[in-house]
């Protein structure tokens, strides 16, 4: 349900990136894909921000956690 705001524009519906690109298996070694779902501080972004479905969010979360344990992605990204 896109509601009109005072500015006169509608909110754009977020698209599930994984479903749109027909990705069957979210590989923990694909850090380029996983970095789309992680904030600049290293935290996993919620569904409401990324627009992924619940099923794909669980896949992404499990892959990010696995990549962190294997030292492919940082737990915390401090600047």
UniProtKB/Swiss-Prot annotation:
GO molecular function annotations of the record: small ribosomal subunit rRNA binding; structural constituent of ribosome
UniProt KW keywords: Ribonucleoprotein, Ribosomal protein, RNA-binding, rRNA-binding
Cellular component annotations (GO), alphabetically ordered: cytosolic small ribosomal subunit
Domain of life: Bacteria
GO biological process, one term: translation
Family: Belongs to the bacterial ribosomal protein bS18 family.
Entry function: Binds as a heterodimer with protein bS6 to the central domain of the 16S rRNA, where it helps stabilize the platform of the 30S subunit.
Name recorded for this polypeptide: Small ribosomal subunit protein bS18
Organism of origin: Streptococcus pneumoniae serotype 19F (strain G54)
């Amino acid at each position: 349900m896109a509601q009109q705001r005072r500015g006169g524009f509608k909110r754009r519906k977020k698209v599930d990136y994984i479903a749109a690109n027909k990705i069957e298996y979210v590989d923990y070694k694909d850090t380029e894909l996983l970095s789309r779902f992680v904030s600049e501080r290293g935290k996993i972004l919620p569904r409401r921000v990324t627009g992924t479905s619940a099923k794909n969010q669980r896949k992404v979360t499990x892959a990010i956690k696995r990549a962190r344990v294997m030292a492919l992605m940082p737990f915390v990204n401090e600047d």
